[in-house]
Every structure is written in structure tokens, then in C-alpha cells.
């Protein structure tokens, strides 16, 4: 689910060549890029929230996608209900809401404009402040009643980054993307000026010039 350009989907297909593997995404542009590389994978354009597979899958796999989808209380049990008996759903999502990099996004949106004024529309600020991924216990409570087993854990990784604005460049492709897309040109520049300065203070370079960036990930493996 959320296959994007299909890199991970092709790895799964190569690992299990006899399986029928379907890559699902809501972006026609992403799927077009995925289809440019021929192979055995089937590609389907659909919304995860309303997706109905042709046949019950043995495995549902999603890597760093479901944090963008609202309504986990409904979607997660719904997905488990699509599995074959004994089927498995494996999910990974970032637990980045409480990290300094993401706290500073919200603070900069709230008061990073001239004279401490907010940036962007109210709707964008609300979306930026929304906590999309809950803590592990909440997902256990949600899934334990609709499955035969739930395995859930967190891992904190440390990225070693290079450059003067290393953390900024890292988050550009993840949590910062909706903000940059939602701001007008002038406000985008104002945001980046303030935000990059705050990031450099929160994540100072080490003695060797590198920057350590810790980030948490939540892993969930559910058996139907």
C-alpha cells in the first residue's frame, strides 16, 4: 500500500517470484513511473481508505505511507478484515511528531512570519499540527480484538548527515513537503529562513562536521 515508484514492491516480487504482487497507490504519476520498469508486479490506482482487492491478500505491506492517511481507528481494522485467515499485515510508520525537527515546523508556522505572525492558511497550520500517528499502545488496543496476534515495537535510528543544513534537506522529502507545497512563494522563503536557523541550533554539527539526526519508527505486524 502506497507503493510509489515501486522500488520496495519489486523487491517483494523478486523475493517471492511465485506470488501475485500488486502495488497500490493513489498517484497516477507515481504509478506511471513504476510501470516504466517491466516485471511481474501488477499496479493499481486506488485510495487505501476505500480499496477492495479482487481477492483476499495473504500479506498487506505498507512502508511509511499510512501516516499520511487519516482515520486509523477505521482503516486498520478494515485492512485486517481483508486478509485471508492467518494472513499478515506489516506496517511501518514514523513517530516524528514529537521530534525537535517537527516541533520546530509547527512553531515556525505559528509564529515565524514578520513580527511573529503566523505563516500560511489556518487550514495548513491545523494540518501541520495534527498528530497523524498514535503511540504503540493505542494501536495494540485497536488491533488486538480483530486479530489472532499483534507484534509491535519501536526502533530509533540515527542518520549521519552532511552539509550546513543537513536536517533541513532530510525533512524536505518527508514531513516538510506539505508545508512547502502549501505556502506561497514569499512565505515559503520566510519559513525556510527561520526554520533552517532553528534547526541548526537544535541539531548542531559534531566535531567531525557531521550532524546526527535521530528518528523513531513504529513497526506493527498483525496476524488475522
Residue ranges and their predicted role:
Residues 59-72, 95:
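A short SAM/SAH-binding and catalytic strip from SAM-dependent methyltransferases
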Residues 18, 40, 86, 147-149:
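A generic structural signal for alpha->beta connector loops
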Residues 7, 127-224:
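Conserved Class I S-adenosyl-L-methionine
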Residues 73, 80, 88-162:
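Conserved catalytic/acceptor-binding region of the Class I
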Residues 49-60:
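A short acidic, Gly/Pro-enriched loop at the edge of an enzyme's catalytic core
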Amino acid at each position: 500500500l502506497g507503493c510509489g515508484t515501486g522500488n520496495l514492491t519489486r523487491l517483494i516480487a523478486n523475493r517471492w517470484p511465485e506470488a501475485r504482487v500488486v502495488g497500490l497507490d493513489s498517484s497516477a504519476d507515481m504509478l506511471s513511473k513504476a510501470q516504466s520498469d517491466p516485471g511481474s508486479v501488477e499496479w493499481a490506482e486506488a485510495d487505501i481508505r476505500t480499496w477492495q482487492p479482487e481477492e483476499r491478500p495473504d500479506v498487506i505491506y505498507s512502508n511509511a505511507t499510512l501516516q499520511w492517511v487519516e482515520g486509523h481507528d477505521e482503516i486498520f481494522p478494515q485492512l485486517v478484515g481483508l486478509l485471508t485467515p492467518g494472513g499478515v499485515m506489516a506496517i511501518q510508520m514514523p513517530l516524528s511528531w514529537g521530534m525537535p525537527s517537527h516541533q520546530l515546523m509547527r512553531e515556525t508556522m505559528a509564529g515565524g512570519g514578520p513580527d511573529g505572525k503566523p505563516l500560511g492558511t489556518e487550514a495548513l497550520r491545523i494540518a501541520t499540527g495534527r498528530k497523524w500517528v498514535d503511540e504503540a499502545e493505542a494501536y495494540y488496543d485497536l488491533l488486538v480484538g480483530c486479530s489472532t496476534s499483534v507484534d509491535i515495537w519501536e526502533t530509533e535510528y540515527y542518520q549521519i548527515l552532511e552539509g550546513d543544513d543537513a536536517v533541513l534537506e532530510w525533512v524536505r522529502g518527508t514531513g516538510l513537503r506539505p508545508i512547502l507545497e502549501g505556502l506561497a512563494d514569499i512565505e515559503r522563503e520566510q519559513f525556510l529562513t527561520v526554520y533552517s536557523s532553528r534547526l541548526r541550533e537544535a541539531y548542531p554539527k559534531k566535531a567531525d562536521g557531521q550532524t546526527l539526526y535521530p528518528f523513531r519508527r513504529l513497526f506493527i505486524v498483525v496476524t488475522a
